From Swiss-Prot:
InterPro entries: PEP_COase, PEP_COase_bac/pln-type, PEP_COase_Lys_AS, PEPCASE_His_AS, Pyrv/PenolPyrv_kinase-like_dom. Pfam families: PEPcase. Keywords: Carbon dioxide fixation, Lyase, Magnesium. This is Phosphoenolpyruvate carboxylase. Gene3D superfamilies: Phosphoenolpyruvate/pyruvate domain. The active site is at H138, K561. One of its GO terms (biological process) is carbon fixation. GO terms for cellular component: cytosol. The gene is ppc. Belongs to the PEPCase type 1 family. GO terms for molecular function: magnesium ion binding; phosphoenolpyruvate carboxylase activity. Forms oxaloacetate, a four-carbon dicarboxylic acid source for the tricarboxylic acid cycle.
Length: 898
């Protein structure tokens, strides 16, 4: 029997009760704020939307005054937010409940460990597995921190709802507290008036560590080792989860990321983890009141106690407390040194020294019958030190390949080596770069020539990276990523810059050079690029110095925008197969970093299915993936959700490593041949419209809120790398975000339907083949399930209203092309799946959408009317911000919009 997703155990009746309470409170609060006739319009809007009377809905919205729009927009933006909180609370409850009753569910860690324990190499698999969620600052998280804090209060109150029902908590007080926070939300600015700075993004990310990661990651690691031990598997230093960070180091297209922000990101992370250690040591100090008149302590703990400055006469026999006081003093001194560069006392040189002191405490307890004392907080502190060190999360550096080329060209020219580097052929570039890397020890930047702002900025960042690695530990920065990598020279250019600051030499690399292959063309050529790189004796030395791992990043967003969903998915799948094979050929462990976004159009979708549908052998023992924008809040907003989602990552990775699927052995060639045919056609269909139709550019910009999104204060990074004059110049995130707002969800399905329909029409038996692929091939099943989900969130009636924003009839006519493909895609997906309706296999999401859709559908009509008024010049600058409120509300309702 196949396991159910944990969400499907959800108690829908409790969620509905909570949503009813929240809705009634919001209505009552809003009623008190508005004139009776305005509030009555809110009720009418809800009724019209529930009845799917879109014409009536449109008429009523059109009649609203600008002032009425203010409160009505807020109401319908807050309502889906409250529904989200209720669902999150129920999921958190279910996580605890199902674990406590020992109920199996899809991705449960205990079930996965039991499965892997049967393998001969179980210890090797579990010891070396490392899954890394990498937090990014991609601008799709539209909520202010103040709003996030308020929603956390409501979340905490709803966690108590079941106790309220049982009479264990005073109902009136609970109800009044809930009302108070909803009322504050109703009167709080939902969106930012000022654009975020990188420093704000760093601070915001740290909130997730304090609220969830610092609890969930050590807890999961402890449980991981405990479960392995229960099966006779002794793990020594397993780190199934470590954390990554882009904020402060990702400067691709973001001019505000500098050496200063890189340093600030690293030191802020350091401060967070050092404060955590300080707090945990103090808690142990309070707890460990053990007296030597009752139990003995080890010689090492006695020595630590002797060195302690805790000289209270009341501590003479409490040697553990005195030892912990000494440890805490060292931690505080270490924090001051690392952050303020000031020596204030005896400190730790490395996190490993801190770990050794904790091990001394642990061993003393074990030697003296204190086994139970090292469970819980103590063992999780040990895990935290192993995982987080003094740096918390490894920060990636990322920059566009064109920037690296410009910097190297300038260096070569100023050093008198070559004045026209950029004009050289690829072969000539590589020959020149390899000569500099292998034979010339000089530092090219050590000339008196004045450096451009670009070169000075890049060198400053790399110099800062080296300083941080020396101070906080080598793992604080492990990777530096090349966006839009297209060739071997792109990788060698980065190596030249790293050589300038001593991060690579002829024997080793202190950071890994990671190419990011993004477009369909670059992914197709990635095998050739990596073959050339792995053939270099110099690269082999660098890889050897990184434990024989070579990471490659895969770009989901740009490949989708470039060739459509089907083409993107298949090209990425084949690239992984080819790159894995090349790694095996050269004896290198190729690992993948998946640059996935929140939406299907950017590689999103259910994480477990996404990982378990990867090609065979593509997951060695490491996998990294980005966690972006609003997805971070949804997945990791509280410790229970964080634990569950991290558990899904770990279990999925293990399952893909050890489970041999039917599609891995029996029929892959047949399936792949079919996919090649279908994908080629899908690519052409997509490109013909997006890049081949001269009116498409105008259609996109006129029929979506892209201009409002570009001016939205939802991130430090600009919406485009350059002035937008074509679709290609637009970043993938606002591209996807805009289609989500207009409810077309175009990037997640366009080109899928017709390509499969044409294949089916060639031979009536082909539908049976596709159904067989759906039943037996996880990749294909995941692909179609994601399209199914995207279609369920689209609304072509609303999309038509956005199309009406186009003035030119030829431009407007593109809607019919999109609508026809939408209908074909829906019919084909249902035919292959064998279902009568969308989301037949996902009852949890279907129920969720059923009761939230009517509310945020209203926001689309409000947004449409506001855009019309803006274009007619009928909105003040303050009133134009209402469009941003509707963007926020729709994004909240969809939950994965960017």
């Amino acid at each position: 029997m196949s396991l159910q997703k944990l969400e499907n155990y959800s108690n829908k009746s409790v969620v509905q009760e909570e949503v009813l309470i929240l809705t009634e409170l919001l209505e009552d609060i809003t009623k008190n704020m508005l004139a009776p006739e305005t509030f009555e319009k809110i009720i009418q809007l809800k009724e019209l939307s529930t009845q799917e009377d879109y014409q009536g809905l449109n008429r009523l919205v059109t009649s609203l005054s600008n002032d009425e729009m203010v409160y009505i927009s807020r109401y319908f933006s807050i309502l889906p937010l409250l529904i989200n909180i209720s669902e999150d609370v129920d999921l958190a409850y279910e996580i605890n409940h199902q674990n406590n009753i020992d109920q199996d569910y899809l991705g449960k860690l205990s079930t996965t460990i039991k499965l892997v324990a049967e393998k001969e190499n179980a210890v090797e698999i579990l010891e070396h597995l490392n899954v890394v969620p990498v937090l990014t600052a991609h601008p799709t998280q539209v909520q202010r921190k103040s709003m996030l804090d308020l929603t956390n209060h409501i979340h905490s109150l709803l966690r108590k709802y079941r106790d309220v029902k049982l009479g264990l908590i005073n109902k009136d007080k609970w109800y009044n507290d809930l009302r108070r926070y909803i009322e504050i939300i109703m009167q709080t600015d939902m969106i930012r008036e000022k654009k975020l700075k990188v420093t704000n993004e760093i601070t915001n990310a740290m909130e997730y560590y304090n609220s969830s990661f610092l609890k969930a990651v050590p807890h999961l690691t402890t449980e991981y080792k405990r479960l392995a031990q229960a099966h006779g598997l002794n793990l020594k230093q397993a780190k199934p989860i470590t954390m990554g960070m882009w904020i402060g180091g990702d400067r691709d297209g973001n001019p505000f990321v500098t050496a200063k922000t890189l340093k600030q990101s690293a030191l802020t992370q350091c401060e967070v983890i050092m404060n955590y250690y300080d707090k945990k040591i103090y808690q142990l100090y309070r707890e460990f009141s053990l007296s030597t008149s009752i139990v003995n302590v080890s010689k090492q703990v006695r020595e630590m106690a002797r060195q302690s400055k805790d000289n209270s006469i009341y501590r003479e026999k409490e040697l553990y407390r005195r030892a912990l006081f000494d440890i805490q003093s060292k931690i505080q001194a270490t924090k001051t040194y690392l952050i303020e560069d000031e020596e204030v006392g005896t400190r730790y040189e490395t996190a490993n020294d801190f770990y050794k002191d904790l091990i001394a405490i642990r061993d003393s307890l074990l030697e003296n019958k204190g086994e139970s004392l090292i469970s819980g907080d103590f063992v999780e502190l040990l895990q935290a030190v192993e995982i987080f060190g003094f740096y918390l999360a490894s920060i990636d550096m990322r920059q566009d390949s064109s920037v690296y080329e410009a910097c190297v060209a300038e260096l070569l020219k100023s050093a008198g080596i070559h004045s026209r580097y950029s004009e050289l052929s690829e072969e000539e570039k590589c020959d020149l770069l390899l000569k500099e890397l292998e034979e010339d020890p000089r530092i090219l930047s050590a000339t008196h020539a004045e450096k451009s702002e670009l070169l000075a900025k890049e060198l400053a960042i790399f110099k800062t990276a080296r300083v941080l690695k020396d101070k906080l530990g080598d793992d604080v920065i492990r990777q530096t990523i090349i966006s839009h990598a297209t060739s071997l020279s792109d990788m060698l250019e980065l190596a030249i810059l790293l050589k300038e600051v001593g991060l690579v030499d002829t024997e080793r690399a202190r950071v890994q050079i990671v190419p990011l292959f993004e477009t369909i063309e670059d992914l197709d050529h990635s095998e050739e690029t990596m073959r050339k790189y792995l053939s270099l004796s110099l690269a082999k030395k660098w890889i050897d110095s990184r434990n024989n791992y070579q990471e490659i990043m895969l770009g989901y967003s740009d490949s989708n925008k470039d060739g459509g969903y089907l083409s993107s998915c298949w090209t990425l799948y084949k690239a992984q197969q080819q790159l894995t094979a090349i790694g095996d050929e050269f004896g290198v462990k190729v690992t993948f970093f998946h640059g996935r976004g929140g939406t299907v159009g950017r590689g999103g979708g259910p994480t477990y299915e996404a990982i378990t549908s990867q090609p065979l052998k593509s997951i060695k023992d490491r996998i990294r993936l980005t966690e972006q924008g609003e997805v971070i809040g949804n997945k990791y907003g509280n410790k229970d959700a964080a634990y569950y989602n991290l558990e899904m990552l770990v279990s999925a990775a293990i399952n893909r490593m050890i489970t041999q699927k039917k599609s891995d052995t029996n029929t892959p060639n047949r399936y792949e041949t079919i996919m090649d045919q279908v994908v080629d056609r899908s690519y052409d269909i997509y490109r013909d419209l997006v890049f081949g139709n001269e009116h498409f550019y105008d259609y996109f910009f006129e029929s979506s809120p892209i201009k409002a999104i570009s001016s939205f204060n939802i991130g430090s990074r600009p919406a485009a790398r350059k002035t937008i004059t074509e679709i290609g110049g637009l970043r993938a995130i606002p591209w996807v975000f805009s289609w989500s707002q207009s409810r077309v969800m175009f990037p997640g399905w366009y080109g899928v339907g017709s390509s499969f329909k044409e294949f089916i029409n060639k031979n009536p038996e082909n539908i049976a083949i596709l159904r067989d692929m759906y039943q037996n091939w996880p990749f294909f099943q995941s692909l179609l399930s994601n399209v199914d989900m995207v279609l369920s969130k689209s609304n072509m009636n609303i999309a038509f209203e956005y199309a009406k924003l186009c003035e030119d009839e030829q431009v407007k006519a593109i809607y019919e092309t999109i609508l026809n493909e939408w209908q074909v895609t829906k019919n084909v997906i249902l035919a292959i799946e064998g279902h009568d309706e969308l989301l037949a296999d996902n009852p949890y999401l279907k129920a969720s959408l059923d009761y939230r859709m009517p509310y945020f559908n209203i926001l689309n009509y409000i947004q449409l009317e506001l855009i019309k008024r803006q274009r007619r010049g009928e909105l003040s600058s303050d009133q134009e911000r209402l469009i941003h409120i509707t963007i926020n509300g729709i994004a909240t309702g969809l939950r994965n919009s960017g």
